Amino acid sequence: MKILKTNYTKRLLLIIFLLIGFSLQAQVKKVFTPRYSASITGDVKMVGNNMLSRTSTGSYNGEQDNHDFVDNVYVDIDSDASTFNSSSANLTNPYPNDSCLQIEKVLLYWAAADKGIDVAGIETENQPNWNYNNVKLMLPGQTTYTTINADEVIYRGKNQNPHINNDPYVCVKDITNSVKNLGNPFGKYQVANVEAKTGFLVSHENTNTGTSGGWQVIMVYKSDKLKARNITLFDGYANVTSSQNNFD
């Protein structure tokens, strides 16, 4: 067994957050705690994508912020009638010539602002036929989706009393074993059905907070040929405003 000598410490603070209204004071709603921590000869890669934009399939390259528009729609690239949104991202092999490269940990996060429409004092669901803590996942080399359920709902605004601003939620799923079983863990990761508010979002405080939603894959990999590192992945939830955004 090779004893690892750590020559420096690398900590990855994974902050899954949604930018919300400017009137609310910045607060940590779910304390950030380690989900993974190890000393390995390896590193981390991350990919992800949005689920809301100006058009369902076109790239937005304008000068304005996406969430400032009042008619944002779901991104939907898959032509699959069973999905209401979908997007993908390519995770490339950082060391394609390293035959010793192994997958250590892979986590999938998804998050969105999920405030419904207030009808006679009752807030509707944005996707009444879908559970927000489920998504559809298509891994590299696959041609069909698998529906997965979150290992943990890190935070959900709708569970708070009173509701918090734009009803954000954050979910996480450990997909390490599924990725390890692939012939090639690198390639296109595609996610569908991240529930989120479309169009225009007015917070519970009657401010324009903007729509938001997306997903992220975090992969920790290792190889005897890489440097020794201490890698720690944190997750939690904090409200972030333009004036108060320092969580050090």
Residues covered by each model-derived region:
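Bacterial Sec-dependent N-terminal signal peptides
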Residues: 1-29
